[in-house]
Amino acid sequence: MIGNWNYGTGRRKSAVARVFIKAGKGDIVVNGKPIADYFSRETSLMIVRQPLELTNHGTTFDIKVNVSGGGETGQAGAVRHGITRALMDYDATLKPALSNAGFVTRDAREVERKKVGFHKARRRKQFSKR
């Protein structure tokens, strides 16, 4: 992007977020909408703001996010991961605090696939003795 933007890519489940941050007054825009309009759950808003509150940069940056795939929780986690990486791109000294909070590590949990002969991933068919 043009200007002094810092970039970070975040992933969670099947969601991918591309996050751009620059000095500003604290506006967060997700897919062209204000964050409060995009995420309906209060927990999703809290998850997205966690790295900013931890590093005391809540009103320091304007953040632009493009996120796709997954559901609301996965997208919120992907945005948090992307914001964390963008903050580390902006200032590498923030990494220890973000790492101790667990925001740097990508949450590798994915949906387990359904197996043949099972109802779901692990739910077996009912056993009948006779």
From Swiss-Prot:
<dbReference type="GO" id="GO:0003723">
    <property type="term" value="F:RNA binding"/>
</dbReference>
<protein>
    <recommendedName>
        <fullName>Small ribosomal subunit protein uS9</fullName>
    </recommendedName>
</protein>
<dbReference type="GO" id="GO:0006412">
    <property type="term" value="P:translation"/>
</dbReference>
<dbReference type="GO" id="GO:0022627">
    <property type="term" value="C:cytosolic small ribosomal subunit"/>
</dbReference>
<dbReference type="Pfam" id="PF00380">
    <property type="entry name" value="Ribosomal_S9"/>
</dbReference>
<dbReference type="InterPro" id="IPR023035">
    <property type="entry name" value="Ribosomal_uS9_bac/plastid"/>
</dbReference>
<dbReference type="InterPro" id="IPR020574">
    <property type="entry name" value="Ribosomal_uS9_CS"/>
</dbReference>
<keyword id="KW-0687">Ribonucleoprotein</keyword>
<dbReference type="InterPro" id="IPR000754">
    <property type="entry name" value="Ribosomal_uS9"/>
</dbReference>
<keyword id="KW-0689">Ribosomal protein</keyword>
<dbReference type="GO" id="GO:0003735">
    <property type="term" value="F:structural constituent of ribosome"/>
</dbReference>
<dbReference type="InterPro" id="IPR020568">
    <property type="entry name" value="Ribosomal_Su5_D2-typ_SF"/>
</dbReference>
<dbReference type="InterPro" id="IPR014721">
    <property type="entry name" value="Ribsml_uS5_D2-typ_fold_subgr"/>
</dbReference>
<comment type="similarity">
    <text>Belongs to the universal ribosomal protein uS9 family.</text>
</comment>
